[in-house]
Amino acid sequence: MSEFRSALMFGRHNAPAAICVCGNTSFFKHPMASKFWVQDCCAATENILLAAVGLGLGTVWLGVHPIHNFSKRVAKILELPDHVKPLNVIYVGYPAEEKPARTQYNPDRVHWETY
């Protein structure tokens, strides 16, 4: 965890555990399909975040991709092969405090049929 804390710009949180969500580009049969690893990993990340909340855990999503420096550091820490790309690191732990629910929903950002 100390390696992540020093490698990531926003990684200074004091969580006891982390999950690194990675895309394995060697799984794709078609060359164009390998471009969608980011979407696949984002869907997996959201599922991890929701499951953690359901278990009473707190999480924070730390972006890694597309910042080459961050990707390189995380790949080195985890000794990832070249075909495995880190998308993010999720810190997981029990929250120190319970914060009130909030939303970032803004109806002005929702467009129907046309922009």
Indicate residue ranges for each PLM-predicted region:
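Acidic, surface-exposed loops and disordered segments
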Residues: 1-115
